[in-house]
Amino acid sequence: EAVISILPEIPEPDPSRPFHRNIRIEDNHFCSADYPILFATSVDGLTFSGNTIERSYDFRPWHPRKAGITVDACRNVTISGNEFIGEVLGRTVSVENMHRREVKIAPGSPYKVVWNKEAARPKLQK
């Protein structure tokens, strides 16, 4: 799904009960020819900060996913202090099946956030 993929082997992610916890991706240098850098599902306490993302031209982009970061059914997500070098692809964060309050993106972030319909409002409990 991405350079870093966090995909638990569970049948249906539940945003109220994430499978993984406390994952920090900090102070790395990514050199990618394609869009997705991080894809995370069902994580409570995900930090992506202080990373440098640089555009590579070694290959043509091939992945159908166009977001640089996708978070799905996660809680307590922080994205801050990242920088781009060159014409980096995937300058968006796609937020899926989450409430807005679960994602904190630092002011001045180079990322644009795209909320899906589920993220705009919390799921109703039955």
Q: Where do the protein language model's features map onto the residues?
A:
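Extracellular parallel beta-helix/beta-solenoid repeat domains
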Residues: 1-126
